């Protein structure tokens, strides 16, 4: 594990140091759990009490909070972002030896860079290409006509079914499936006819896709994630969707086919997005919301019923069913008075 002094961290990240610059930091932790050899941070005033009782050797915080700290501190404009950058210094991953594991299966027409790592029980299909310094983790399946650009990582048991293109430095977590058939059906004489899904999936540079998430290939056009999109676990992105750059989508969200999500959007957990609509740039959708119409104005949007005690909720539910009747009565009374 690397060790840094407070002074070294201040210089590396251009931070203002107050206190002992010679304190040696071995890792990072929360305010409540940090030891004198660890660094922590304060980004939310609600944790000021924890700051007062923290044993952390160094604390990253905003200039407005420096008077509340008694030990060594690093002043940052955005303590949360700064902490994230410092934490990466301690996130040391074991090196993977380049080469193809003897228990992997690679089609003769596929290309694997000599600097890539291909783990055990990996299968790579026809005409697929693995770029330089890629890591293809144990049990991953790469189908035909897939391309993985330099520096990307499939952690383990990732499936790229067919016609999937990954950009540079893409990271995909276990259980994710990309390039599955989109849910396309046409009804004829009381029976469903399956519509062939002839498109692909395109993932931009620096994207991350969480465990057990699914991104379906397009029917005709590709399903696209632009650069620096971050997808949490258990997210479903249907065929022909397009997700704009720098957008983040939290777990259990479902996006129906052909929806277009703008840049710098944030979708909370368990959001539902109806198909064939558009969400403009810089939109925040709070958790459990359902987006039924296109959004053309940036801002924060919510839907659903807030949590309350069960007794109150049941009363409100009964009154909700009576709203139409009550409105009609009010309109009738207004007409009588007029």
From Swiss-Prot:
One BP term from GO: lipid A biosynthetic process
Keywords of the record: Acyltransferase, Lipid A biosynthesis, Lipid biosynthesis, Lipid metabolism, Repeat, Transferase
Active site per database record: 239 (proton acceptor)
One Pfam family named in its UniProt record: LpxD
The reaction(s) this protein catalyses: a UDP-3-O-[(3R)-3-hydroxyacyl]-alpha-D-glucosamine + a (3R)-hydroxyacyl-[ACP] = a UDP-2-N,3-O-bis[(3R)-3-hydroxyacyl]-alpha-D-glucosamine + holo-[ACP] + H(+)
Purpose: Catalyzes the N-acylation of UDP-3-O-acylglucosamine using 3-hydroxyacyl-ACP as the acyl donor. Is involved in the biosynthesis of lipid A, a phosphorylated glycolipid that anchors the lipopolysaccharide to the outer membrane of the cell.
The protein's name in its UniProt record: UDP-3-O-acylglucosamine N-acyltransferase
Organism (species): Xylella fastidiosa (strain M12)
